[in-house]
Amino acid sequence: MKVVVLVKQVPDTYEKRDIALDTGMLVRDGVENVVDEIDERVCAVAAELKKAGTATEVVAVTMGSADADKAIRKVLALAADSAVHIVDDELAGSDMIQTARVLAAAAQDADLILSGAESTDGGGAMVPAMMAEILGRPHIPYADSIEITDDTVTGVTNTDTEQLTLSATTPAVVSLTEKAGEPKLPNFKAIREAKKKEVSVVSPADLGLAAGPDAAYVRNVMVSAAERPPREAGQKVSGDTAATQ
């Protein structure tokens, strides 16, 4: 079974995040960019599938700027056998629709596509479902755990009121929560071997796609962006005043 793991490089959550008011996009320059933590957990699930012999090949796929190589190498050390890095200046600031189109084209030959339920920078949580729709495949959302038997993947999803057990025939798309896997620090051998693994750098054109705002048949448009208004001081009520009311 070929497993594709979707990976995203995001600004470190421990640092302050700012929005560029002229574009409405997250400022990524001048900050530490890292592999999204939830993607490390997805890699842990893929590593277990590989260890069990269920996954015969694990490929990491990311869409991002050229400086995402460091993040890719970490994922190669964690679980992946190879990686596909989609790079194009026209992809900067892509909305979820364009992101799903590009990632779906890159991952279409996978038997199982694993993704984090939502990224820490955008939090849209819609890209996996969009990919499934584009590829015509079933989608299991927000799975806390998965099991694979023959050509069936089963995921357990917990809602506020109940627990759901969902099954789908592969090829399929599954989005995983932070409960799905526990990432492990790669050892020195894994880090060294990751430097030798293949990373295919491709463009949307290589995938048979056009990129950019004019290429999208439907897209989100940022209308305006403004700084959050400063918080006003709360009204102070003395103990004596409260007692008399």
Task: Show where each model-derived region lies.
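N-terminal glycine-rich FAD/FM-binding segment characteristic of electron-transfer flavoproteins
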Residues: 1-245
